[in-house]
């Protein structure tokens, strides 16, 4: 019978994958072959979702700004256009925060945007 010269290396690789798969359900955390596939797939999802997270947060901010702008009688696109014309440079993340936590300040921004459009 031939010698197994990479037993230590193989075990180390298997241990590494099984450690990464810790917490997965059933065979995905116990059987190397299944765990390997699960870890690879998890990596693909993580890679994809790191990019999607940026899109999703921007989407959320725009939805919040739109809702707050409409409460003050203005659409999102007209509000953003008004801010540009008034040369107010606040990014959407901060605008969304203001819309949620400081309604008076947001109303003041809407008035400035309306003034710039008029």
Curated annotation (Swiss-Prot):
Keyword Ion transport: no
Residue stretches spanning the membrane: none
GO MF annotation list: rRNA binding; structural constituent of ribosome
Highest taxon in the source lineage: Bacteria
Record-level GO BP terms: ribosomal large subunit assembly; translation
Gene Ontology CC annotations of this record: ribonucleoprotein complex; ribosome
UniProt record similarity statement: Belongs to the bacterial ribosomal protein bL20 family.
Function according to Swiss-Prot or TrEMBL: Binds directly to 23S ribosomal RNA and is necessary for the in vitro assembly process of the 50S ribosomal subunit. It is not involved in the protein synthesizing functions of that subunit.
HAMAP family attached to this UniProt entry: Ribosomal_bL20
Protein name: Large ribosomal subunit protein bL20
